[in-house]
A protein has these predicted regions:
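Hydrophobic anchor at the beta1->P-loop junction of P-loop NTPases
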Residues: 21
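Conserved substrate/cofactor phosphate-moiety recognition/catalytic segment
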Residues: 34-74
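Glycine-rich phosphate-binding loop used to anchor ATP phosphates in small-molecule kinases
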Residues: 66-131
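Conserved phosphate-donor/acceptor-positioning beta-strand/loop module used by diverse small-molecule
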Residues: 115, 131-145
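Small-molecule kinase domains that catalyze NTP-dependent phosphoryl transfer to phosphate-bearing small molecules
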Residues: 140-183
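P-loop (Walker A) phosphate-binding loop of NTP-binding proteins
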Residues: 24
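ATP-binding Walker
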Residues: 27
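Walker A/P-loop
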Residues: 30
């Protein structure tokens, strides 16, 4: 643990959250993010490589990374907040007095898992400021020498909620992540 804001983890786990798993390439972000999404039963995983492939931005310099991260942050915020607006519930739920739209339950937001290199603390802070008490950061660290060509020299670790070394077997790392997230 790095001393991030872990005091409100119990409040966070009762809300639909945006989980950021970030770190250098090949640190296990996608593998752990997919496992986390399955555990949370959410279809929303924003994987940096897949996300980049959807757009024309192939720039791995600072400007390209910032653009990609800002776009991912906007999508994560949208997905997380979708369905939690009071006016939506008020308009569509008045007829039957329940919490449904044509028999379908209204969601109270959605968990979103982000698996990005995300090297810039300011962009992670921007996401947290736009989603008060709904963002949980885990910095994934690995000593493996994979995909070094894509490593970011000016990586800003910042002050995440937790630091997780991913050099162990995936099952051990997954167990530690669940323990950190209290899920």
């Amino acid at each position: 643990m790095l001393g991030g804001d872990t005091g409100n983890i119990d409040n966070k786990k009762n809300n639909k959250m945006i989980y950021i798993l970030y770190g250098q390439p090949a640190s296990g972000k996608t593998t752990l993010g997919t496992m986390l999404a399955e555990h949370l039963d959410t279809p929303f995983v924003i994987d940096g490589d897949e996300f980049r492939e959807m757009f024309t931005n192939k720039n791995y310099g600072r400007a390209g990374r910032e653009e990609n991260i800002r776009n991912a942050n906007a999508v994560a915020t949208y997905l997380n907040k979708k369905g939690e607006r009071d006016d939506w519930s008020a308009i569509y739920c008045k007829k039957d007095g329940g919490n449904s739209i044509q028999g379908r339950p209204v969601k109270e937001g959605t968990d979103v898992v982000m698996c990005l290199v995300n090297p810039y603390e300011g962009l992670r802070e921007e996401l947290k400021n736009n989603n008060q008490d709904k963002v949980f950061e885990v910095f994934l660290k690995s000593n493996r020498d994979l995909r070094k060509d894509y490593h970011v020299e000016d990586f800003e670790v910042g002050n995440p909620d937790h630091l997780l070394n991913t050099d162990e077997e995936i099952e051990e790392t997954w167990d530690r992540l669940k323990e950190l997230l209290k899920i």
